[in-house]
Design a protein with these regions (language model features):
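Active-site/acyl-donor-binding loops of N-acyltransferases
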Residues: 2-7, 13-32, 95-96, 179-180, ...
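Compositionally biased, intrinsically disordered/low-complexity regions enriched for serine, proline
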Residues: 6-7, 15, 36, 51, ...
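A conserved beta-strand-loop-helix scaffold within acyl/acetyltransferase catalytic domains
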Residues: 25-111, 163, 173-329, 413-418
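Polar/charged alpha-helical tracts
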Residues: 47, 84, 148-160, 164, ...
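Low-complexity, flexible helical/coil segments
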Residues: 71-74, 113-118, 126-130, 210-214, ...
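Acyl-donor binding region in acyl/amide transferases
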Residues: 74-77, 82-83, 94-200, 314-377
Length: 420
């Protein structure tokens, strides 16, 4: 570890088909590949799973916590490629009924909404997706030191296995959720050859912090914003802050604040921005100190929390909850932001990743954006051709009001910097 469903039984993981798909290849040190659908990431040891991925806090422990408390309607599992009995590739999976209307912007959004009302089964298919509803970066695990040819071969085998598994569990659409620009550089061609299309997902905001202290960071902001932040911090002077590794005894309050904050969001992404019951306690317990929570109290009462994951060179801000209208009266969002910036600088952590919402504020505060993609394909060839034709009109970023307003002012990181 790195620290610094309707129509189908909900417990899909216990009903995974036991098939194994074998793939023999040439010109590679890998002798023979078999791809197996597994009911959980725990079917592979923690060390064997983590060895396939770059060091990250969103590792086996994180995925296990997500499996134990999924959002409503989600079921989690995994797919692993083996060379003999040695795992050489792996992806986490989830299955969910997904509203296709969510991904279409003008001019198809009106038609999609109409079809959703008239043909709900057509517009709400059962999707089998690579990734996690709790992660903003799609984990594609390939064995360390794999050559380019081996990496392509392992991914192609995983894709073939996914097609078989999707058919076995009744999913008509396959998807890769939030593939980073960095992974798209090597995986795109293989995915396209396998019949996948893609459209933009929501980008991820990243703040680079190569500063010696908070004053240096503030000096990079516009003078008017600096004055505004100083005023907001003075208004929040009564707020008491604690950084903890446990929410024992307060998890009900944390869940309540999270639900309250969801009701104030400008865009609703359904269960994709929700968590399951007891998720926060599971996360804090499973991540052994990599998960921290900033607790803000006013007069002894919890008014805000911010769950974040600590890596060697990056902090991932994952979940925030605030009490309203206190949040606005005391500028708790900005207070949380500056306290997290202070934490990163104090710990010499150079990057603060803040997720897929509230882009306008994050850009003003110095963030840049990492592009990400959703790759998808239908199992039926004709339906897949129709989805391919609709792909240019699909884009989650077009549904976000902040991104529409930012337009060309949004600054994106180049693809080769999208991977930490």
């Amino acid at each position: 570890m790195v620290c610094g469903i309707r129509g189908r039984p909900p417990n899909l993981a216990s009903r995974i088909s036991p098939w194994a798909h074998s793939c023999n290849g040439r010109g590679s040190a890998i002798s023979s590949l078999s791809v197996r659908a597994l009911p959980s990431v725990t079917a592979v040891s923690r060390d064997a799973w983590n060895a396939l991925f770059p060091p990250t806090a969103e590792d086996w422990n994180f995925l296990r916590a997500s499996e134990m408390a999924p959002p409503a309607g989600f079921s989690a599992s995994a797919l692993v490629a083996f060379d003999g009995d040695q795992p050489v590739g792996a992806v986490p999976l989830f299955q969910v009924k997904f509203s296709l209307a969510m991904v279409f912007g003008p001019p198809l959004n009106t038609i999609a909404d109409w079809l959703s009302r008239g043909r709900p089964a057509l517009m709400n298919p059962l999707v089998l997706a690579v990734g996690s509803p709790q992660s903003e970066e799609c984990p594609i695990g390939i064995r360390r030191f794999a050559t380019a040819a081996e990496r392509t071969r392992i991914l192609a085998s995983i894709l073939q296995g996914l097609l078989h598994h999707a058919d076995a569990v009744g999913s008509s659409i396959l998807a890769f959720k939030d593939v980073t620009d960095g992974d798209a550089l090597w995986a795109h061609e293989t995915l396209i050859q396998a019949g996948f299309s893609r459209f933009p997902s929501l980008p991820v905001a990243v703040l680079e912090l190569p500063f010696r202290d908070e004053a240096e960071y503030l000096a990079t902001l516009k003078p008017r914003l600096r004055s505004e932040l100083r005023r907001k911090m003075k208004q929040a002077a009564e707020v008491e802050t604690e950084i903890a590794t446990s929410i024992d005894g307060i998890h009900d309050q944390v869940a309540e604040l999270f639900r309250e904050t969801r009701t104030h969001r400008r865009v609703d992404y359904g269960s994709f921005d929700d968590v399951g019951p007891n998720f926060f306690p599971e996360l804090m317990r499973n991540l052994n100190g990599c998960a921290r929570v900033m607790l803000c109290r006013l007069g002894g009462k919890l008014v805000s929390f911010n769950v974040f994951l600590v890596e060697r060179n990056r902090v991932l801000a994952k979940y925030i909850g605030m009490r309203y209208p206190i949040a606005r009266q005391y500028n708790l969002y900005y207070y949380n932001w500056l306290m997290m910036v202070r934490f990163c600088i104090d710990q010499a952590i150079p990057q603060f990743q803040t997720g897929q919402t509230t882009y306008e504020i994050k850009m003003r505060l110095g963030s840049k954006l990492k592009r990400s993609w959703i790759y998808f394909r239908h199992l039926q060839p004709l339906a897949n051709r129709l989805l391919h034709a609709a792909a240019p009109f699909a884009a989650l970023d077009r549904r976000d009001a902040d991104l529409r307003e930012l337009g060309s002012k949004a600054v994106y990181l180049p693809a080769n910097r999208s991977q930490t």
